[in-house]
Amino acid sequence: MYISNLRLQNFRNIPAKSFDFKNSINFIVGKNGSGKTSILESIYFLSHSRSFRSSQLNRIINHNADEFIIYTKAYNPDEITISLSRKKNSNNISKLNLEIQKNHTEITRNLPIQLINPESFNIINSGAQQRCKVLDWGAFYLDKTFLKIWQQTKFLVKQRNSALKQNYPYSYILSIDKKLCEFAEILDYKRHAYFTKLKPKIYEILSHFNPNLQLDIDYFRGWNLHKSLAQVLEESFNYDNKYKVTNHGPHKADIVLSVSHKPIQDIFSRGQQKLLICALKLAQGEIHNSENDNKCIYLIDDITSELDSIHTLTLFNYLKQLKSQVFITTTEKNKINEFIDTNSYILEI
């Protein structure tokens, strides 16, 4: 998959603009506020139907308009078109090859995106939910049945929490538990299948960045490995009932990062943590590319301000080896001069 043309209308501070890109590394150079990150944001929005910068639509729509439109022409290898429009207080419209979509799932499948930006480096210090999204992204593309299992599991956890809050009888909770355990086991299997591919790939890429970094990467399914979920839910019911929330289950899954059983945030420097996240994101894209025909697209925002020159060079050299389209923003062209070659494309805005 690669994007050849992107058209934006009333997206952020871009009233109307068309951009052409190459199926290689595309550098977007501009001052702060010039709109370079907005280009990455629009591509991300096309894939996810949401922004990585704001959850408020009014902030994304140009202040002089009531609607924004994003359109792209891409190849996979055949030509496809994706477009969406978002209006204030109105219905959303998403189209794939000119056909209106009931939901965004097929567009997401057709446009896999990996984002590396300053907020990405918070994955290590944020809660388990953010790290679990890493597993769910990969499993979604690896297994077409994953989404329905994930949606049903999420619904059952929500239903159980609601029943706890409303003091429903224990017999009713047990009826939910029976269904939840069934779907949770399947979800755990699919997540673990993806994790077994992800873990060695992270180690492999990390060795290119810093061969001296040592860490343990483990998968936690959300409940005791040596007990069934049914047993755990039964044993923890009084605690769950007291706090009116389900404390164990697939919604508590996590990727545990440690060094000698200590959290890596207590061991790794900030720079080492950033390298790990870069390795994780690259690993996700590589696994996707090996399992799917539509190649993952990388969006990398202002990375030169996050990594030193040596590690930036290592990252860029690694990106050049990938058969993926890459978008990289920077405020200073001189910071990327040594990375530019004949296959690169530079957009100055």
From Swiss-Prot:
Main localization of the protein described in the UniProt heading: cytoplasm
Single Gene Ontology BP annotation: double-strand break repair
Family stated for the protein in its record: Belongs to the RecF family.
Function of the protein: The RecF protein is involved in DNA metabolism; it is required for DNA replication and normal SOS inducibility. RecF binds preferentially to single-stranded, linear DNA. It also seems to bind ATP.
Binding site for ATP: G30, K31, N32, G33, S34, G35, K36, T37
Name assigned to this protein: DNA replication and repair protein RecF
Molecular functions per Gene Ontology: ATP binding; single-stranded DNA binding
The entry's keywords: ATP-binding, Cytoplasm, DNA damage, DNA repair, DNA replication, DNA-binding, Nucleotide-binding, SOS response
InterPro entries attached to this UniProt entry: DNA-binding_RecF, DNA-binding_RecF_CS, P-loop_NTPase, RecF/RecN/SMC_N, RecF_2
Organism the protein comes from: Francisella tularensis subsp. novicida (strain U112)
GO cellular component: cytoplasm
Keyword Cell division: no
Location(s) in or outside the cell: Cytoplasm
KW Iron (keyword) present: no
Pfam families noted in UniProt: SMC_N (PF02463)
Domain of life: Bacteria
